[in-house]
Amino acid sequence: MAENLYFLKLKKPITVDNTNEIIVYKYFMITTYATNGALAVALTPGLEDSYDTIILSVNLDAESLALPQGEFFLDINNLERTLIQQLDEEGYIKPASESAISGYVVYPAVHGLMFKQCERVEASE
């Protein structure tokens, strides 16, 4: 796996009914994929890089977003509304302030060092 890939284990798994298919997500998958340090965040059932995971966040330029330290923009759409609601209820995310970009922000680490209620798990595990 890529050196810039690691996982954050959720303390409480998130269960989503996705078009009559129940999926239990246990990890955030964190990866950087651009020279400017862009971050992608996905939920994944296990410790593997899977193309069918849901990409929840792309932080294309942390500098230009001007969000508070320890936060980054989480881009969402209606297809992910149920999942976003569950992540919100469990305390993994919080709504952005009215003065910020519309959507959600994930915290507390812009650089993916740690998320609230998660423990880091190396990709090699």
Regions found by a protein language model. Give the residues of each.
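Intrinsic disorder/low-complexity signature
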Residues: 1, 14-15, 72, 85
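Short, Lys/Arg-enriched, disordered terminal segments
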Residues: 1-4, 123-125
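Long, low-complexity, charged/polar intrinsically disordered regions in eukaryotic proteins
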Residues: 2-49
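Hydrophobic transmembrane signal anchors and adjacent membrane-proximal interface regions, especially
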Residues: 5-10, 56, 65-67, 72-74, ...
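Low-complexity, intrinsically disordered short peptide segments enriched in small/polar/basic residues
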Residues: 11, 19-21, 51-55, 90, ...
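Short, compact, well-ordered microdomains
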Residues: 76-125
